[in-house]
């Protein structure tokens, strides 16, 4: 692809994403499906703006590569060892059972047995990019089902190696393509990568970090990820597996969070590009000519994988309320099918339109997953949020809660426990099914679902409640929920969690004056203890803490970004210069004795 064509393609990708994803979010179908539909629109079977799909699809796999690196950073080797049973037990069972059933059905559909085996293995794989994205959106990452889902996906990535090696054997060309010496060299190179990464990566990043130049650290991170991907690709292995291993090797290093921050922006953009590329690859011509075959294939594929996954989740001991989510999030075909089927086609295992039919089936199955997850969410919401059959209800089951708490993470738990301890009637909204089940055991009134849905808020008693406490992890969800409450439930007293000054400014601009910055109060308390440790009288340190809180809050309100950036920067610099002077002057002039009951936020 020429430079000008690449630039044009980049502009088209960005335009498609900007146009389609917000529309998909407004329709409630999720960002992933929005990307897929955008790809169909600009691809060769849509408006035809881009025709070189294969090259773009290969490039867009970098999104999956970056995603797997970040996942590796979150899993240290000891944690990976703890998951061995689910990886090699449930993961292997899912691939083998699904592949066997699907291969048998393909043989009934007049596929050669060799092609059916390859087709069954390819269809048994799930989309790592889509599944992980949806698990993050649905809050499944910390749940049992999310951990099991990740284990299955990891085994599927490991299964890439033997699956690709199996293709020439099935094609009858093993003598020409299977070289034991080359295999041994690949294993040796892989071992060198593991050992070298284990002992060299930390010293290298320590040397780079010592330079103090953030851009160089980001460049080094990109170099590591891309080098690991290219190295594994040269060995004929999965690029995503290589970067995952690199992430695991750095998971226990002191640079883990900095590495994650450096990669995260690239990961999100390239993942979007990957989904757009998958949408572009959908062959609508094959779909039109074999509509019934493709439709039946998609339904059968999703049903078989869901049934297999559901049964395995049951055997593994996953809660019944989480099994459907686990089964549906992995029910689609995956990106690995494109690689495996292309390799099989080069070995002439497929006849006629068989490869095209399989790829269309995989692509459409990926489009069904967001819709399937949305439907299951509604079903779970009706099931979990329905009226209790218990006649004996604890006092927290009052139909008219005083407070609605959105989110039951570490921040929300403290608030909910404090309110419960003071006999306040509360209702909790949470989208982690495991947390919902646990909270109900302890007498909390909990509603499962997305709190940004008006109907869920109504069901939770928003029309009768006095206050709502928003403790969402994502700032976007917080601001969306604030706007929703102001529009539909203007009587609610809104209190919110702010992750930092930027979100605090956004809340102030939205009219929310009661908020708490999650690290501010704890930092002030530690600062007070530091002053005491340096010899300051405890009472004086307490007064200093309260004065600083008031001054900081005043500056926060005065620096709401209503003017240009230069004006705001100028005011911030001026405020910093005057902070010490103001602090000392007001400490001296303060006549009122402040104590711990004064409220400044």
Curated annotation (Swiss-Prot):
Record's bilayer topology term: Multi-pass membrane protein
Primary localization: membrane
GO biological process, one term: proton transmembrane transport
Keywords for this protein: Antiport, Cell inner membrane, Cell membrane, Ion transport, Membrane, Potassium, Potassium transport, Transmembrane, Transmembrane helix, Transport
Pfam families found in the cross-reference section: Na_H_Exchanger, TrkA_N
Top-level taxon: Bacteria
GO MF term set: glutathione-regulated potassium exporter activity
Family annotation (Gene3D superfamilies): 1.20.1530.20, NAD(P)-binding Rossmann-like Domain
Subcellular location(s) of the protein: Cell inner membrane
Subunit field text: Interacts with the regulatory subunit KefG.
Family, per entry: Belongs to the monovalent cation:proton antiporter 2 (CPA2) transporter (TC 2.A.37) family. KefB subfamily.
Task of the protein: Pore-forming subunit of a potassium efflux system that confers protection against electrophiles. Catalyzes K(+)/H(+) antiport.
Annotated protein name in UniProt: Glutathione-regulated potassium-efflux system protein KefB
